[in-house]
Regions:
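Extracellular jelly-roll beta-sandwich "head" domains, especially the C-terminal globular C1q domain
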Residues: 1-143
Length: 143
């Protein structure tokens, strides 16, 4: 049987400033085996183990100013220990059109006891832009 923590956001968008990696926060816990979720933004394994980490997110639809043809970049990544010695992994830079596509990424990496993991997002649009929907899941079969 799997041990799983799952965080979810869909009711209130999270506004993300441009050119700054921002830790996603979530609105609720869907599943919280072994009390692994922290502050509605992090999953912290209680024991070492192999984990399957997944994230699913959607940026709000974007409207560009007339004549603005500059390409935009919208990225996401998993981040270990975001408030301490930061270690990012599983970064994704998909050619997405915000609001018209979903980004789903799964990455297998070690879950260390007491080491929190989160999801960060980044964009280079000229103004803050919202993430409308996000899910973050950590799953292990090691305990």
């Amino acid at each position: 049987m799997a041990t799983q923590a799952k965080l979810y956001r869909s009711e209130r968008p999270q506004l993300v400033p441009p050119n700054m990696w921002t830790l996603l926060t979530f609105e609720k816990r869907i599943r919280n085996d072994r009390s692994m979720t922290r502050d509605l933004s992090l999953i912290m394994p209680p024991f070492d183990g192999d984990f399957l980490w997944s994230r699913n997110l959607r940026w709000a639809a974007i409207t560009l100013p007339e004549g603005d043809t500059r390409p935009r970049q919208f990225m996401s990544r998993f981040i270990r220990d975001p408030a301490g010695v930061r270690d990012d992994t599983g970064a994704a830079d998909h050619p997405v059109t915000p609001g018209r596509s979903w980004e789903t990424t799964t990455w297998q990496f070690w879950g260390e006891a007491g080491m929190p993991v989160g999801v960060e997002v980044w964009h280079d649009h000229h103004e803050p832009w919202p993430v409308e929907h996000a899910q973050f899941v950590g799953t292990t079969w090691d305990y």
